[in-house]
Amino acid sequence: MVVPVKPLAAAKSRLRGALPGVPHEELALALAADTLRAVLACPAVTEVLVVTDDARVAAAARAAGARVLPDEPNAGLNAALRHGAAGARGWVAGITADVPALRPTELTGALLAARNSRPTVRRFLPDTPGEGTVLLTAPPGKPLDPRFGVGSALAHAASGALPLDGDWPSLRRDVDTAADLAEADRLGLGPRTAALVAAGRPARSAG
C-alpha cells in the first residue's frame, strides 16, 4: 500500500483554521497518522510505503512500522504514487492520507473486493460525494496509473478502472473541509485527530 503525504505546511489548505487554537500542521499530521494507523492494522495489507519529503511525517511513519520513500519526483500526488508503486511485483494500491476515521475492517473489505471481483483490472473507490477517489488498486502486471485530483472518479473510470461498490463509510470519508471533518468525527475519528478536535472545541460553561 502506497500512502503519499505532502509536506505538512502545504497539506490540506482548505482545512486551515478549522480547529481554533490548533496549529494547521498538527492537524495535517494527525490526519495522516490516523490513516496510517488503520492501514497498518489491516490484515489484507502486507507492506505500507509512505512517500514523503516531510521529516515529521517520515518519523511518524517509521515509528508506526511503515517504510518511507523520499518523494523524489516532487511533482504532486500522482507522481508520488507512481514512484511508490514502481517496484511492486504483486497487487499494489494507493490510498489518500486523509481518511482519519478509517476502520481496518472496511479497508480489508474493499481490498478483498478488488482482488476477488474482476481481479484483472484496476479498481477505484470514490469518496463520499462520489467525485473524488480515496483508494486505487492494480493487479500484478498492471500499472497503478493514478489520476487523483479534481474529478478523479471520472478520470479513473475513463482510464479503464472500475469502481468498487461497498458499504465502507469510514474509508470513503476523506477530509478536505471543516464539514468533512465534522462528518468524520461522527463516524469516529482515530485517536490523534480526535484529540485535536476535542482540543479545538470551545469550552462549555458550567451554567
List each language-model region with its residue ranges.
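Short glycine-enriched, charge-decorated loop/helix-capping segments at active-site entrances
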Residues: 15-23
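N-terminal nucleotide-binding beta1-loop-alpha1 segment
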Residues: 1-16
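A short, N-terminal amphipathic alpha-helix
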Residues: 28-45
